[in-house]
Amino acid sequence: MTPRQVRHGLAVLQQHNLLFYHTDPGAEFASYEANPDNAYNLVRTGKILEMIDTSFGAPAKDVMQSLLLSGQTRVSDLVAAYKEKIEQGNQTESTVGDDNDFGIEANGVNGDSKADKKAGPLIKSTAHLNTIICRLVEAELIDVVHPKTFESSEDILKTVEKEVMQKHFPAGVKGNKAKVELQERIAEGLRKVRGESKSLKRKLEQNGSAAKRRKLLAGFGMANGAHDEDMDPALDPRQVIRINYEKCLVDLRNRRLVQYATDMTGETTAYVYGVLLKLLTKDLSRCRADLVMDAVGDKDEEDDKGPGSVTTDQILDNLKTSVDLSLGIGKAERGQVSSTAAEKIELYPPKKKVLIEEAEVDGEASADEDEGEDESSEESDYDSDYKASTTHGTNGVNGTNGTNGTKVKFDESAAPKERRMDRPAQLRQHLLMLAESTQHFVRHCGPNEWTVDFVPVMKSLREAELDSVIERTCGRQGLRLVRILRAKGKLDEKALPNVALMRKPELQQKMLEMQTAGFVSVQEVPRDLKADVKKSFFLWFCDMDSSLSRLLDTGYVTMVHCLQVLEALRRKERDVLETTKRTDVRGREKDTMRKSYYERYSRFLESERKLFAQVMRVDDLVSVLRDF
C-alpha cells in the first residue's frame, strides 16, 4: 500500500472510531491501537436500529442509520446531506429511498414501501432533523466528539495521572493522606474527561427544551413531532457527533430483561417492568463500570439504594391507559395473603443486607425485635393502603383470568368504575410479583419506592442462559446434575449417585460428558501424604465462572466461523452477486436473471439469512455474558 492509501485507511477507521491513537508531547509519530469494542458493536447495528425505531420512531432510526454508515459526522455535513435528500424527495417522491447514500431503503423492508412513497421522505425539513438530533442527544444515544475520544482508557488514565502529579504533587507523593488525595484528584480528572462528551446534552438541559416537550408530549411521538420543532435550539453546525454505544447497550439490556421477565412472569407484568427500567435507567450512562476510569471513582457517589429508585406514582403516570393491569394477577382470599410479608421493604442490596444482619447478631437479642417493630411500623402504611384496596382487589381481575378451574370461586360483582379506581393497587400487585420472584427483578427499597439491583438480576439471567445451553448439550439429566452440584457444593463421587438417584455407570458417563463440555470439574483430595489414587476422594463441583468463560469463548469461535462461511459463500457466488449490482437488474432479479443464476442467488440469500440469524443469536449470548 502507498502512504496515501495508508493515511486514507487510517482516517476512515478513525472516523468510525475503530482505532485509538496517542501522540506524546513533542513526539513526531503517533501510536495506533485497535478499538475492539466498537468493532464488535458493528454486529449489533440491526438491533440498535430496531430499538431506536421502537422507542423513537422511523425518522430517528433513519438518522441513526446515517450516523452508523458515516461514522463521526459534523452537524453541517449531516444537514447538507439531508437537504439534498429532502429536495430530491419533494421532486420525485416515487423514487425516495432507492438512490440515497444514507440507507433509507431499509425502512421499506416490512412491505410498507407504498406508504413511504405517499408520505415522502421521513425527514420533512432541517428543523425536523434538528429536533430528532436534540432528542437523541438528550437520551444520550448521541454524544459529542472531543480530542480524548480518540484515546484509549489506559492512555487517558496515564495522561490524567501525569497532569495531576505535575500540578499538585511536583515533589512526589508522601504519606497516606497524599495518596488518598492523589486518587481523588485522578478520579475528578477522569470524570471531567468523561463529562466532555455530554456537553451538548447539558446545553440542551439548560435551555429547557426537554422539560417543555415533556409537558406538551406524552412520549416520543417522532412521527407527529413536527409541531414542536421550534422548541429546540439550533445546533452548532461545527459540532461533531457520534453514536454512544454504551447508552445503546443500556437500552438493549432493558429489552433483554423485559424479555426475561416475560418468560418468567407474563406479558403485563413484564410491560410494567419495562416502564420501571426505562425510568430507572434514564440517567444511567453505561451497563458496567469501566475497569480503568471507574476504578478510582468517588465513593460519595455510591448510593445505598443502587442505581436510584422510582415511585409507584411515576410508574403509573408513564403507563399506557390502554394496558389492562388486571391481566396476569392471581386471586386469593384476604386471609390467605400475608400483607406483612408481601409488603416487606429491603433498604439495601442483598450483599449489603447480609453484612448488616451479621453485625446485628453480635448485639442484644432485642435489637432484631426492635428492627422488626420498626419495619412493621413502616409497613403499616402499606398495610392500610393494601387493605383499603382489597375491597376491590379481588374484583380487579377481569373474567378472562383464573376461570379454567372449577374449585376457585371469585366475586365478580364489582362495577367497571370500581375496577378503574383500583388501577394503582393492581400496579402494586405487579411490582410485588417482581419483587418476590426468585430472579430478583425488583427490590422494594422504600415506601412506594422500587429499584433494580442489576448484579443479581444479570447473575440469574446468565445462569438461565447457561442452563439452556447445558440442557441442549447434555439433556435434562445433565441439567439436573448441575443444579444439584450448585445447591450442594462439592460432592464425593461415591455420594453423588445416592443424591442424584441414578445408577453409578450412567452417572459416571453423564459426568464425563459434562466434564468434556466444561460444565463440571473434578478435584482429587488425597486422604494421606502418600497421595494414593485408590485412597483419594474425588469431588465433583460446578464452577459457574469457568463455565461462563468457556461458553463465551465458544460463542466467539461460533460467530467467527459463521462470518468465515459467509465470506466463502460470497467468493463462491461472486459472479452472481456482481450481476445483481447492475442498475438494470437491481430490484428485478427474478425477471432479468437466468433461471440457473436466480436459483443460485436465492440459495445464497437463504444461507446468508440463516448465518446472520445464528450470529444474532450468538450475540444475544455474548451480550448477556460480557456486556450487560
Swiss-Prot record:
Acidic residues bias locations: 360-383
Lineage: superkingdom: Eukaryota
One of the Pfam families matching this protein, by short name: POLR3C_WHD
Compositional bias segments (type: Basic and acidic residues): 408-422
GO molecular function: single-stranded DNA binding
Segments of skewed composition (Low complexity): 390-406
GO BP of this protein: DNA-templated transcription
One cellular component (GO) term of this entry: RNA polymerase III complex
Cellular localization per UniProt: Nucleus
Span list, region Disordered: 360-422
InterPro entries listed in its UniProt record: POLR3C_WHD, RNA_pol_III_Rpc82_C, RPC3, WH-like_DNA-bd_sf
Keywords: DNA-directed RNA polymerase, Nucleus, Transcription, Zinc
Residue span of region Leucine-zipper: 555-576
Known function: DNA-dependent RNA polymerase catalyzes the transcription of DNA into RNA using the four ribonucleoside triphosphates as substrates. Specific core component of RNA polymerase III which synthesizes small RNAs, such as 5S rRNA and tRNAs.
Protein family membership: Belongs to the RNA polymerase beta chain family.
Assembly and oligomerization: Component of the RNA polymerase III (Pol III) complex consisting of 17 subunits.
Protein name, as recorded: DNA-directed RNA polymerase III subunit RPC3
Organism: Chaetomium globosum (strain ATCC 6205 / CBS 148.51 / DSM 1962 / NBRC 6347 / NRRL 1970) (Soil fungus)
